[in-house]
UniProtKB/Swiss-Prot annotation:
Domain named Kinesin motor: residues: 213-543
CDD domains to which the protein is assigned, alphabetical: KISc_KIF2_like
Binding-site residues, ATP: G303, Q304, T305, G306, S307, G308, K309, T310
Region entry Disordered, spans: 583-607
GO biological processes: cell division; metaphase chromosome alignment; microtubule depolymerization; microtubule-based movement; regulation of chromosome segregation
Species: Rattus norvegicus
PROSITE patterns per the UniProt record, alphabetical: KINESIN_MOTOR_1, KINESIN_MOTOR_2
Annotated GO CC locations: centrosome; cytoplasm; kinesin complex; kinetochore; microtubule; spindle
Keyword Hydrolase: no
The name this protein goes by in its record: Kinesin-like protein KIF2B
Residues the record lists as Phosphothreonine modifications: T125
GO molecular function, one term: ATP hydrolysis activity
């Protein structure tokens, strides 16, 4: 490069020879080459010489402005070696101008060639914008002296680069140690390769959700200490604000490992860095104001035991103590009391009451009254009443937190194979607004017990197995009620469990709003439970995944990455029936067979609701399987004749059209 050429080597100065002796070669008005701070080299006129301090002052004109600077004598001699000795000055030969900067680089002379020139004295001031310099006929390379500051900077830079190299070596060594000791190293490599091809979106780009009667969100927790010790893998990826991907490791017959990537779409998805405040902002917060408009709001956390439900609803744990001020309980209470003081609702003179009870083994217990057993009855107005439930009036957030702490201390918990401190009951905390002693609105915050698979509780005690069966039964009933709420069905199966009976007023009516927070564990050992949770949440509100092509990976076996289906299989709907193609009107007039074909097709389309009725019955909690099968077979036998007749008519119509086309 041009910038690598420097000046002719100056005669080496003897340490005994003072620098002042070289001032004999300097005169005010001569032109010398100087170097700017941006590495440009151009000519300047010497205007002052300080022999005591060994520096000179130079001036030049740049862009119509006269500039100047002080330069040490040693620096000037390095750039002007011809001044170092009178012998060199006397034997100076004529110099020729050479362009050192291309014409296209006017104004930027950082790559200017570092040549020195001695030009006879002129009356004009040299310009810093000049593109040409007069150079000696025999230029040679020289070593430019660096300032102490620059030398220190370079020293620090070398030390920094050395430290970085050492850190990279240490990280590579640690990664190698981890990988060799991790039995799932191949799966981890496939997951990392797949994630590198995904486009992540920032959580800060989230917008408040639309006004839905039901909102389904998913929250992923980080790997806990137990999973990290076991060298478990994080198999959950959240590429955008509403998509969750599960990388399930599978094995082929030839023992080749591959990934089956299952994708789910929800209203919102939160990764392991999301705080409780962020989760609350997009889940329960939009529902708070609805209870001031005589609405019934419900927010519940669902997921595997140990996936973070109680952490989300109640707050973070510090040992066995829970910080309730950071949970959704406290955040809802803060917004309720803030809205209560606004002018729009202050005139209603509303009072706030709090209740806290649990549902364990199909029975209801009051957590604010020493776990007193309660009865759930239906009055003459078909309203569910929890007889004996204690309601305590609260006037601030601190009083609400006291109720939460009191209830959590009495809540039933136990030890499972997954979680040493697992909640074994459904806890329901309610904030009730009353106006003149009458119910105005209610917000139910439900911390559900963890769902469990039978395989996980096979070695558990009989008590734990009965607990798990009762929990799963109530969760199934809750799912059906929420689906009926989301689809505006006329029938809601809330009598299937005590949990749905207690929350009946949250499912019935047009002012009912529900938010579900599905918490999932990221570990590979929890893959089956995570998929069950996501399928449950997906069935609650089936959202179509937006068609977005994710970039495939270029790896072949054994790094095969297969994209699995995203959502759980949808049931057959009446719109899925095969439709008969429409024939042009001219052919309809010419063919009598087509008219007869319309009649069975019409009867088939009119019989669409029968399948929907059977489907709704089969999806119920207490459905009779034998009755559904018998009813379906009976109806299908009746429809077989209709389908056979349609088939014959279509064949005749096709033959007729072929004959006409041949005749033409």
């Amino acid at each position: 490069m041009a910038s690598q050429f420097c000046l002719p080597l100056a005669p080496r100065l003897s340490p005994l020879k003072p620098l002042k002796s070289h001032f004999t070669d300097f005169q005010v008005g001569i032109c010398v080459a100087i170097q700017r701070s941006d590495k440009r080299i151009h000519l300047a006129v010497v205007t002052e010489i300080n022999r005591e301090n060994s520096w000179v002052t130079v001036e030049w004109v740049e862009k119509g402005v006269k500039k100047g600077k002080k330069i040490e004598l040693e620096t000037v001699l390095l750039l002007n070696p011809a001044l170092a000795s009178t012998e060199h000055q006397r034997s100076r030969r004529p110099l020729r101008p050479v362009s050192v900067i291309p014409a296209t680089a006017i104004g930027d002379q950082r790559t200017a060639t570092k040549w020195i020139a001695m030009i006879p004295h002129r009356n004009e001031t040299p310009s810093g914008d000049s593109q040409t310099l007069v150079i000696p006929s025999n230029p040679c390379l020289m070593k430019r002296k660096k300032s102490p500051c620059l030398r220190e900077i370079e020293k620090l830079q070398k030390q920094r680069e050395k430290r970085r190299r050492l850190q990279l070596e240490i990280r590579a060594r640690r990664a190698l140690d981890i990988n060799t000791g991790n039995p799932n190293f191949e799966t981890m490599r496939m997951i990392e390769e797949y994630r590198r091809h995904l486009d992540s979106s920032k959580m800060s780009r989230l917008e408040p959700p639309e006004d839905h009667r039901i909102c389904v969100c998913v929250r992923k927790r980080p790997l806990n200490e137990r999973e990290t010790t076991m060298k478990d893998l994080d198999i959950i990826t959240i590429p955008s604000h509403n998509v969750v991907m599960v990388h399930e490791s599978k094995q082929k017959v030839d023992l080749t490992r591959y990934l089956e990537n299952q994708t789910f779409c929800f209203d919102h998805a939160f990764d392991d860095t999301a705080s409780n405040e962020l989760v609350y902002q997009f889940t329960a917060r939009p529902l708070v104001e609805s209870i001031f408009r005589k609405g019934m709001a419900t927010c519940f956390a669902y997921g595997q035991t140990g996936s973070g439900k109680t952490h989300t609803m109640g707050g973070a744990f510090s040992g066995k103590a829970q910080e309730c001020s950071k949970g959704i309980y406290a955040l809802v209470a803060q917004d309720v009391f803030l809205l209560l003081r606004t002018p729009a609702y202050e005139k209603l003179e509303l009072k706030v009451y709090g209740t806290f009870f649990e549902i364990y083994g199909g029975k209801v217990y009051d957590l604010l009254n020493w776990k007193k057993k309660l009865q759930v009855l239906e009055d003459g107005n078909q309203q569910i009443q929890v007889v004996g439930l204690q309601e305590q009036e609260v006037g601030c957030v601190e009083e609400v937190l006291n109720l939460v702490e009191l209830g959590n201390s009495c809540r039933t918990s136990g030890q499972t194979s997954v979680n040493a401190h697992s909640s074994r009951s459904h806890a329901v905390f309610q904030l009730i607004l009353k106006c003149g002693g009458k119910l105005h609105g209610k917000f139910s915050l439900v911390d559900l017990a963890g769902n469990e698979r039978g395989a996980d509780t096979a070695k558990a005690t009989r008590k734990r197995q009965l607990e798990g069966a009762e929990i799963n039964k109530s969760l199934l009933a809750l799912k059906e009620c929420i689906r009926a709420l989301g689809k505006n069905k006329s029938h809601t199966p809330f009598r299937a469990s005590k949990l749905t009976q207690v929350l009946r007023d949250s499912f019935i009516g047009q002012n009912s709003y529900t938010c579900m927070i599905a918490t999932i564990s990221p570990g590979m050992t929890s893959c089956e439970n995570t998929l069950n949770t996501l399928r449950y949440a997906n069935r609650v509100k089936e959202l179509a995944l937006e068609a977005r092509p994710y970039p495939p990976t270029d790896h072949e076996m054994p790094l095969t990455l297969e994209n699995g289906n995203t959502n759980s299989e949808k049931s057959l709907q009446k719109d899925d029936i095969i439709q008969i193609p429409t024939v042009q009107k001219e052919e309809e007039k010419e063919s009598d067979e087509l008219t007869s074909t319309k009649e069975p097709a019409a009867s088939w389309s009119r019989s669409g609701p029968w399948w929907e009725a059977i489907q709704e019955t089969a999806e119920g909690v207490n459905c009779d399987v034998d009755f559904c099968i018998a009813q379906s077979l009976s109806i299908l036998e009746q429809k077989i004749g209709v389908l056979t007749e349609i088939q014959k008519k279509l064949q005749l119509l096709r033959d007729d059209l072929q004959k006409k086309s041949q005749a033409e």
